[in-house]
């Protein structure tokens, strides 16, 4: 209940607006370190796990895909719960989303190109359609109408959660045969991928001398990915039942682990630098 109410609160207060990008000017070090961690740690971990577990090629590509995606709203919710730097979290999510049309296809071409054919331009176009166009429309809507359609502010988190649940059901049904044969191994890989993302994200920031609040923030930004985007890309590739499996498993798990970590951190006041 605490997590769902926080999600609604963060959505209403942090629905993407032009203000979210001011953090690039106010916190350039945190944004730069966060982006570097975001687009190195998880893609490399994904490639390593896909190779180590020797998954079928399209399943392996799905693991790399979820690792190569930007963070999503869930990381903002967890940062809020964990008393982390919510402003940095929102800015990182916004900037990572905007650079995703270049970074995600580049990482997929580089790391997953040996598993499945990757069309850079087609994937870039897909990401524009799935994320960038809705984000731009959301920015415009938020600028002109935020607070004027309160029923929409309340409805959107519910609609989003219902939509995600429906998509996961479709992927699970479509990938039933693969799930029965490698499901447990894929769940294990998703858990390792996610947990190591938190660990490397947190300690990577520690190495650069970031404060505790910022380290917590970037741990969530790195460990929690935009499963909806990864699923959309898999659908556009026509491989929802294979490439889409890893994002479908990673998404629910990251919310469980993220909530647990956020609750644990919530009771521990961030140490001052």
Regions found by a protein language model. Name each.
Residues 14-23, 73-84, 139-150, 201-209, ...:
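C-terminal ends of transmembrane helices
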Residues 153-155, 210-234:
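Helix-helix packing/entry segments at the starts of transmembrane helices
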Residues 1-7, 11:
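Single conserved hydrophobic/aromatic residue that forms the stacking wall/gate
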Residues 37-42, 68-74, 89-109, 127-131, ...:
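Membrane-embedded alpha-helical segments of transport systems
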Residues 42-47, 103-112, 166-178, 227-245:
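Hydrophobic alpha-helical transmembrane segments in multi-pass integral membrane proteins
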Residues 14-23, 52-55, 111-117, 141-149, ...:
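Transmembrane helix-loop junctions in multi-pass membrane proteins
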Residues 28-35, 55-68, 84-94, 119-124, ...:
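The feature identifies polytopic integral membrane transport proteins across all domains of life
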